[in-house]
A protein has these predicted regions:
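A polyampholytic, Gly/Pro-enriched intrinsically disordered region
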Residues: 100, 195, 222-226
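Short amphipathic alpha-helical interaction/hinge segments
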Residues: 167, 225-228
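Polar low-complexity intrinsically disordered regions enriched in Ser/Thr and small residues
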Residues: 5-6, 90-91, 231
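Short cysteine/histidine-rich metal-coordination sites, predominantly Zn2+-binding motifs
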Residues: 206-207, 227-238
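Acidic interhelical loop/turn segments
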Residues: 172, 198-203
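ATP-dependent adenylation/nucleotidyltransferase module used to activate substrates
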Residues: 12-194
Length: 238
């Protein structure tokens, strides 16, 4: 049926309660650090949602590579066709140009995918319920971000109430360990954890070399500079 999520690459359908953490892993810098935290504290399971975004294949490659490096064996890749069909974002509609960081402005940018994180969380919470996991990790960040409304603390407080009231046992908690951190702090934390930044992908528009000019690339480059660290991925413009 058109628009329904499809699921692939699930290495295990185990329902063991030892999977205490499910982490949403896009393949970007923030989600990579979040995954490193989850893998440190739990036997984690990782879920990746593809939704027809411009860099879909590159992000999926990053997801698999990060899982290998962090030794996360239990993985779920879900394709959500609905977000691509709905459109309304430069990430899913090729007729809408991806703006450079200097042209983003003060309002919510066109790279915002409408209510995207709700789709992601629904998948992760459902899987957590099957696995018996009690925590769902997501690398949402409010400071030094593009200003997306689904990256605010109030959003996750509300979604935690949804998870509490809408699951069988009501014990699943959405965890946002990075939400109040500056990007440079996230880089430093990732380096301490051994997060594989070399495998991550943040660019909104390109899959060969990161463009270096979209909002996501610029925020990432500034973060590494502020942290006094080297960004290990390649850029077309730096």
């Amino acid at each position: 049926m058109g628009g329904c999520p499809s699921i692939s690459n699930q290495q295990s359908t185990m329902t063991s309660s030892r999977f205490r953490g499910v982490v949403l892993l896009s393949g970007g810098m923030d989600s990579c650090v979040c995954a490193a935290l989850a893998a440190r504290d739990h036997e984690a399971a990782a879920v990746h949602v593809s939704y027809g975004q411009r860099t879909e294949q590159r992000e999926k490659q990053s997801f698999l590579g990060i899982c290998e490096r962090l030794k996360i064996r239990h993985r779920l890749i879900v394709r959500n066709e609905a977000l691509g069909m709905i459109g309304g974002s430069a990430l899913t509609d090729n007729s809408i140009p991806v703006p450079t960081a200097e042209n983003v402005g003060q309002s919510v940018p066109v790279t915002y995918v409408p209510f995207r994180n709700a789709h992601f969380l629904a998948v992760a919470i459902s899987w957590a319920e099957v696995l018996g996991a009690e925590k769902v990790y997501i690398g949402a960040v409010e400071p030094d971000s593009s200003g997306y409304p689904d990256c605010r603390p109030a959003y996750y407080r509300a979604f935690n109430e949804v998870a509490r009231t809408g699951t069988k046992e009501g014990k699943i908690e959405i965890v946002t360990p990075l939400i109040a951190m500056r990007k440079a702090e996230i880089v430093r934390l990732g380096l301490e954890l051994g997060a594989p930044f070399d495998l991550t992908w943040s660019c909104y528009s390109r899959e060969d070399a990161a463009c270096g000019v979209c909002d996501s690339c610029v925020l990432r480059l500034r973060a590494f500079t502020a942290a006094g660290a080297h960004d290990p991925i390649s850029y077309a413009v730096k």
